[in-house]
Swiss-Prot record:
Belongs to the RuBisCO large chain family. Type I subfamily. The gene is rbcL. Its cofactor is Mg(2+). GO terms for biological process: photorespiration; reductive pentose-phosphate cycle. PANTHER family: RIBULOSE BISPHOSPHATE CARBOXYLASE, RIBULOSE BISPHOSPHATE CARBOXYLASE LARGE CHAIN. SUPFAM superfamilies: RuBisCo, C-terminal domain, RuBisCO, large subunit, small (N-terminal) domain. Binds 1 Mg(2+) ion per subunit. Keywords: Acetylation, Calvin cycle, Carbon dioxide fixation, Chloroplast, Disulfide bond, Lyase, Magnesium, Metal-binding, Methylation, Monooxygenase, Oxidoreductase, Photorespiration, Photosynthesis, Plastid. The lineage of its organism: Eukaryota, Viridiplantae, Streptophyta, Embryophyta, Tracheophyta. NCBIfam families: PRK04208.1 (NF003252). Heterohexadecamer of 8 large chains and 8 small chains; disulfide-linked. The disulfide link is formed within the large subunit homodimers. This is Ribulose bisphosphate carboxylase large chain. The modification N-acetylproline is found at P3.
Length: 477
């Protein structure tokens, strides 16, 4: 070892344990445009000051460990350490704080969501000094955004591929999600697409089970969508779930989908993992496939308000990793989703530039520069009576997906699809004429039902179905 190295490492080194805040709490720090910024909801253990808790988060998610180490002298901690630069008390909550942490960009591998999340949320969430910890938001700097491909195609390219403009896209998840044979599954796909839907979908847990192997499903679904296209003159798609037990098997399924000439494949990005997802997204761009993303397992991570990771972070991570659609909740259906919070992360998915807006849960201004946008997918417990609200909430750049709300129609699958298409066209027409969908929605649906027996039957079946439960995740006061 050289004398210079020995001198650098030994000068000022003192073994032992010292408070994190002495090194990692820096309220005077001015954040840089190249820093990744994080907002953590911190609940310290009794007796732990908030400054120490915030500094511990910064340390344990960057360069720190529980004791001083000799090798600290071999690098520049000031260059590489995370810094807790601000602490806010959460109004209305006992012993909860928002700790803002800045991370130098050099801590992260270029183009790797996997590495970014491993660093920021990898170990620190099990830290004993904290009762609970939640990552509320991230600011991804432009310098880091530009190292990612992002969505394979984006909203405008998808519309051009489908030749569909001026309205939300319509989809349907095939039910029952498990148990159908491949041929009966394909039959349901055909009936729904023939009836007027743009897409049908594999459910998240449809992979390759004994009752329906993936290759058989792909073949029958391809036959169904090409037949429906020929009959309707519209471009159709079915989300063929390529999720598999290995990346190699996943890619084999995606390649087969491309060889069949189908326009879109699907991936469960959280259970499948970010490395697999980014690999698939790159393949989809190179080979002209759209990529639908399901967020299965998200509520395990994001539903509790004081611990875990907010979905807006998972949404940003998905936009970086790559996907053309992602499920986003419905606000009005059976799944968790408060309106302002949902609209906040929907904007983070679709827009190029999003201003900080705490009223919608957005902690940082985010500039995506040229990264393509992602279509939010509203799915889960929705039916024709929800159509005005969904059109008003999500606007044109969205996918409205009715599973039971299509296949549960009393006359069958194709009439269920007709009912949804008529309801959507009526709502878009009324909106374009200046009518208030939020106030006049039920009247608009009733008027359309006079001319569509399929819609009238759907209205009768689901007239009393509501899901009135308070959201678990709400904005701070």
């Amino acid at each position: 070892m050289s004398p210079q190295t020995e001198t650098k490492a030994s000068v000022g080194f003192k073994a032992g344990v010292k408070e994190y805040k002495l090194t990692y709490y820096t309220p005077e720090y001015q954040t840089k445009d190249t820093d990744i910024l994080a907002a953590f909801r911190v609940t310290p253990q009794p007796g732990v000051p908030p400054e120490e808790a915030g500094a511990a988060v910064a340390a344990e998610s960057s360069t720190g460990t529980w004791t001083t180490v000799w090798t600290d002298g071999l690098t520049s901690l000031d260059r590489y350490k995370g810094r807790c630069y601000r602490i806010e008390r959460v109004v209305g909550e006992k012993d909860q704080y928002i700790a803002y942490v800045a991370y130098p960009l050099d801590l992260f591998e270029e183009g790797s969501v996997t590495n970014m999340l491993t660093s920021i949320v990898g170990n620190v969430f099990g830290f004993k000094a904290l009762r609970a910890l939640r990552l509320e938001d991230l600011r991804i700097p432009v310098a880091y955004v530009k190292t990612f491909q992002g969505p394979p195609h984006g909203i405008q390219v998808e519309r051009d591929k489908l030749n569909k403009y001026g309205r939300p896209l319509l989809g349907c998840t095939i039910k029952p999600k498990l148990g159908l044979s491949a041929k009966n599954y394909g039959r349901a796909v055909y009936e729904c697409l023939r009836g007027g839907l743009d897409f049908t979908k594999d459910d998240e847990n449809v992979n390759s089970q004994p009752f329906m192997r993936w290759r058989d499903r792909f073949l029958f679904c391809a036959e169904a969508l090409f037949k429906a296209q020929a009959e309707t003159g519209e471009i159709k798609g079915h989300y063929l779930n390529a999720t598999a037990g290995t990346c190699e098997e996943m890619m084999k399924r995606a390649v087969f989908a491309r060889e069949l000439g189908t326009p879109i494949v699907m991936h469960d990005y959280l259970t499948g993992g970010f490395t697999a997802n980014t690999t698939l997204a790159h393949y989809c761009r190179d080979n002209g496939l759209l990529l639908h993303i399901h967020r299965a397992m998200h509520a395990v991570i994001d539903r509790q308000k004081n611990h875990g990771m907010h979905f807006r972070v998972l949404a940003k991570a998905l936009r970086m990793s790559g996907g053309d659609h992602i499920h986003s909740g419905t606000v009005v259906g059976k799944l968790e989703g408060e309106r302002d919070i949902t609209l906040g992360f929907v904007d983070l998915l679709r827009d190029d530039f999003i201003e900080q807006d705490r009223s919608r849960g957005i902690y940082f201004t985010q500039d995506w520069v040229s990264l393509p946008g992602v279509l939010p997918v509203a799915s889960g417990g929705i039916h024709v009576w929800h159509m005005p609200a969904l059109t008003e909430i999500f606007g044109d750049d969205s996918v409205l997906q009715f599973g039971g709300g299509t296949l549960g129609h009393p006359w069958g699958n194709a009439p269920g699809a007709v009912a949804n298409r008529v309801a959507l066209e009526a709502c878009v027409k009324a909106r374009n004429e200046g009518r208030d969908l939020a106030r006049e929605g039920n009247e608009i649906i009733r008027e359309a039902a006079k001319w569509s027996p399929e819609l009238a039957a759907a209205c009768e079946v689901w007239k009393e179905i509501v899901f009135n439960f308070a959201a678990m995740d709400v904005l701070d006061k």
